[in-house]
């Protein structure tokens, strides 16, 4: 089904009316899927009754009466984005009171899409941050991520808004696809996602792809941890969350990535883009069986060589199930996950620049190479000198 026809059919099925103009993104790819079960689109109170996104003016959320806010028969989230509690005034794209906007210290690569992120914690509830590596969220927590991409004529347009909500039975998640005129955002209700949305090249992931990334995190949320709320974060920090009453104590969250600037940039990039979701030691993580772990843990931040990224990658041969199709040299004997001083024989870099093959990294959600990310990781490997092991043969 063509993208326009698909979204049009969803709009018609939802009984939705038109109205409102496009949002103005301030930043830079689940569809109808559920984990467990839970209630429908209930209103949330927000983080302790705090103001709107980024401290801006806000409007109180009220369940709209001009659209059907019921969840589809096979789901628990409402069909229309307006019913989720993100906007106090949808027509003006005014964020609801208690919804907080944030930007993590390191952003996940999404083919250059501009993103805005929002969170709502139920009033009177707190996030358990006693384990800085694994935050636990209260029931009713909601995270939204809005994607804007380059459309016809080079102008930015809204593509999708993803939602994660924690229910009594677990996390539920979906993606709301914006109509071509950007006046409505309706929940994806197929199992396939959308490829090349409105000719922009943007892909809305299918439900399996959403789960593949998020199950690699203890409580499902990516991009919200001690490091991502630390140096470089915008909108929210651990300290501001204490002030808002969202967390009780930030004393164990003052973590710093080890090393010089080059090392910190590379380790932070690999943590956010590879380690948080897939390359970590959680049994559910998609790349757990590779033995290549790139997530930064609080207990290993004393020095670079103590990190999983260094211990499991430097001078390590790739896993037996590694994919080499599409590489200029497909001989496994040529490769190390990281070969100090030699990005050209480091499979980590080769996968970063690979696209269109199973071995590309990130494996899903991207069709374009992150040139900046490649440069960051390559420079780290190139500068591995005195304090690093000598390169393997």
Go through the PLM ranges and name each one:
Residues 57-70, 134, 153-326, 330-393:
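Sequence context surrounding c-type heme c attachment/ligation sites in exported
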Residues 1-3, 7-63, 392-393:
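Ser/Thr-rich, Pro/Gly/Ala-heavy low-complexity intrinsically disordered linkers and tails
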Residues 61-131, 137-139, 144-151, 157-188:
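Conserved small-residue
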Residues 39, 49-52, 140, 341, ...:
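Glycine-centered flexibility sites
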